[in-house]
C-alpha cells in the first residue's frame, strides 16, 4: 500500500538527496532513555502543576448556574461542534447537510492518500496535503466563528 511505502534506497537520486541531508533523518537521539525518562515526566508534571496551580489560585464558576425552568434563547452545541453545526444551520436541505457532515471525516481519511508517492515524511515536501490541511483548518475556524454569530451574518462574519 502507498501509505506504508519505504524509501527506495537503490534510487541514485534519492541517495544523492540523502547524502546532502535533504531526506528524512531516521537517526539521531534515541527516545529511550532520553525522552521517556527525562523530558516526558517534566512535561507531564509541569502540565499538572500548572493546572492545579491555576485552579487553586483562580477558582471561578464555570458558566452560568443552571435554571431548569428557563429555556435559553438560542441553544448552542459545545465549541468543538460549531463547524458542523454551522453547516447544518446554513444548508437549506437537511439531507445535504448530513452528507456534508459525513464528508468531514471522509475528507480527513483521504488526506494521507493524496501524496502517497512522496518518499519523504517532511510535511514541507508534501505541498498538496499541507495545503488541504491548512485550507480545511481555515474553513473549520471560519465556520466555528460563524456558528456563534446570528444566522444573517454567520457566513460572512459581518465583514462583507
From Swiss-Prot:
Recorded topology in the membrane: Multi-pass membrane protein
PROSITE patterns cross-referenced by the UniProt entry: CYTB_CTER
Name recorded for this polypeptide: Cytochrome b6-f complex subunit 4
Function according to Swiss-Prot or TrEMBL: Component of the cytochrome b6-f complex, which mediates electron transfer between photosystem II (PSII) and photosystem I (PSI), cyclic electron flow around PSI, and state transitions.
Any one biological process term the GO annotation gives: photosynthetic electron transport chain
Similarity comment text for this entry: Belongs to the cytochrome b family. PetD subfamily.
Localization per Swiss-Prot or TrEMBL: Plastid, Chloroplast thylakoid membrane
Transmembrane segments: 36-56, 95-115, 131-151
Pfam families associated with the record: Cytochrom_B_C
Chief site of localization: plastid
GO CC terms in record: chloroplast thylakoid membrane; mitochondrion
The species this protein was found in: Chaetosphaeridium globosum
UniProt GO MF annotations: electron transporter, transferring electrons within cytochrome b6/f complex of photosystem II activity; electron transporter, transferring electrons within the cyclic electron transport pathway of photosynthesis activity; ubiquinol-cytochrome-c reductase activity
Domain of life: Eukaryota
Binding partners and assembly: The 4 large subunits of the cytochrome b6-f complex are cytochrome b6, subunit IV (17 kDa polypeptide, petD), cytochrome f and the Rieske protein, while the 4 small subunits are petG, petL, petM and petN. The complex functions as a dimer.
UniProtKB keywords: Chloroplast, Electron transport, Membrane, Photosynthesis, Plastid, Thylakoid, Transmembrane, Transmembrane helix, Transport
Amino acid at each position: 500500500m502507498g501509505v506504508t511505502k519505504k524509501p527506495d534506497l537503490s534510487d541514485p537520486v534519492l541517495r544523492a538527496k540523502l547524502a546532502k541531508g535533504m531526506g528524512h533523518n531516521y537517526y539521531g537521539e534515541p527516545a529511550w532513555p532520553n525522552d521517556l525518562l527525562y523530558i516526558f515526566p517534566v512535561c507531564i508534571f509541569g502540565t499538572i502543576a500548572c493546572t492545579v496551580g491555576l485552579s487553586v489560585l483562580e477558582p471561578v464558576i464555570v458558566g452560568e448556574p443552571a435554571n431548569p425552568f428557563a429555556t435559553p434563547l438560542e441553544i448552542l452545541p459545545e465549541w468543538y461542534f460549531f463547524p458542523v453545526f454551522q453547516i447544518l444551520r446554513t444548508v437549506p436541505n437537511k439531507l445535504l447537510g448530513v452528507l456534508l457532515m459525513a464528508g468531514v471525516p471522509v475528507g480527513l481519511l483521504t488526506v494521507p492518500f493524496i501524496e502517497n508517492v512522496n518518499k519523504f515524511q517532511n510535511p514541507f515536501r508534501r505541498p498538496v496535503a499541507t495545503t488541504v490541511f491548512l485550507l480545511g483548518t481555515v474553513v473549520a475556524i471560519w465556520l466555528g466563528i460563524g456558528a456563534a454569530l446570528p444566522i444573517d451574518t454567520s457566513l460572512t462574519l459581518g465583514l462583507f
